[in-house]
């Protein structure tokens, strides 16, 4: 009987394996990152790379995205704009002037005409083989590998959702936007019905106050995560961050510029590695569980030494 039971169990497992096309049930990197994001008790820090790996490749380009995936980055932040024929493409600016060999608003180009332009590299050199990618092209590269923060994209929610569904990566998408508590509640409902994660952006003023954060702490459903910006570090930041995390939300910091993180930024940590704990360590002490960075490789190395990143 025991042998029959073991054989039956083996057949069940084998059938499950075959029904999945012979693929392992091991969670994908994107699924692992999403699970960490959704778990308030998770200690691992999520690393989000700002405009992908723009230090080594054109920002918002396919090679830049592929580079941060190889690094082990958890979230890639990309920016979207729409062409004149209604196609979402990756562009931080409303014009193509800074990042390509062309000029004019993105919205004045059809996709075909935009694809004739060539992206500029880190030092302004023209990249003969690289054009602005579409959002669909970018999400296809990201599928199963990395979460995607679609910045400048909230006004295009239906279009982003349609593309994400086509690529089958809806649960990898993160939206963020500023606005009132009521606007956030409506956005959370809209995103929650699809599986997309919505993250409100809140700011602590130089005087240490934030009416927006206060409105969240007054009650109601809390978002999974807040993006918190603060130009001046103070004990008020400690108070607010503790209140948000005690309420069950995670918090995201932008270490890309000092004006967004009380001068605890990437460049200070990178240029003075012996003092990295003064900067990154301070942000960790505040309870931040996601860092948007311009130094993804350096930050990952710092976090791994502390056992805070896989």
What residues fall within each predicted segment?
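Bacterial Sec-dependent N-terminal signal peptides
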Residues: 1-31
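Phosphate-group recognition and catalysis centered on beta-loop-alpha active-site segments
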Residues: 20-310
């Amino acid at each position: 009987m025991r042998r029959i039971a073991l054989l039956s169990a083996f057949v069940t497992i084998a059938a499950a394996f075959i029904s999945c096309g012979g693929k392992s049930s091991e969670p994908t990197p994107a699924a692992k990152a999403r699970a960490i994001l959704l778990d308030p008790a998770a200690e691992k820090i999520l690393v989000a790379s700002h405009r992908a790996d723009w230090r080594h490749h054109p920002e918002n380009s396919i090679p830049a995205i592929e580079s941060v995936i190889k690094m082990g980055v958890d979230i890639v932040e990309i920016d979207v704009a729409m062409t004149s024929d209604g196609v979402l493409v990756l562009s931080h600016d409303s014009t193509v002037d800074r990042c390509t060999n062309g000029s004019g608003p993105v919205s004045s180009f059809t996709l075909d005409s935009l694809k004739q332009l060539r992206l500029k590299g880190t030092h302004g050199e023209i990249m003969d083989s690289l054009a602005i990618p579409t959002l669909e092209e970018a999400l296809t590269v990201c599928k199963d590998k990395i979460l995607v923060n679609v910045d400048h994209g909230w006004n295009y929610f239906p279009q982003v959702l349609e593309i994400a569904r086509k690529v089958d990566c809806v649960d990898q998408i993160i939206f963020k936007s500023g606005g009132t508590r009521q606007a956030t509640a409506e956005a959370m409902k809209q995103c929650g019905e699809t599986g997309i994660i919505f993250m409100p952006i809140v700011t602590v003023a130089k005087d240490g106050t934030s009416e927006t954060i206060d409105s969240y702490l007054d009650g109601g459903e809390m978002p999974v995560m807040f993006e918190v910006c603060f130009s001046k570090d103070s004990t008020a930041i400690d108070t607010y961050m503790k209140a948000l995390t005690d309420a069950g939300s995670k918090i995201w910091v932008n270490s890309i510029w000092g004006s967004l993180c009380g001068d605890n930024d990437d460049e200070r940590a990178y240029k003075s590695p012996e003092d990295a704990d003064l900067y990154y360590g301070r942000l960790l002490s505040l309870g931040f569980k996601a860092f948007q960075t311009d130094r993804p490789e350096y930050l990952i190395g710092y976090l791994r030494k502390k056992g805070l990143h896989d």
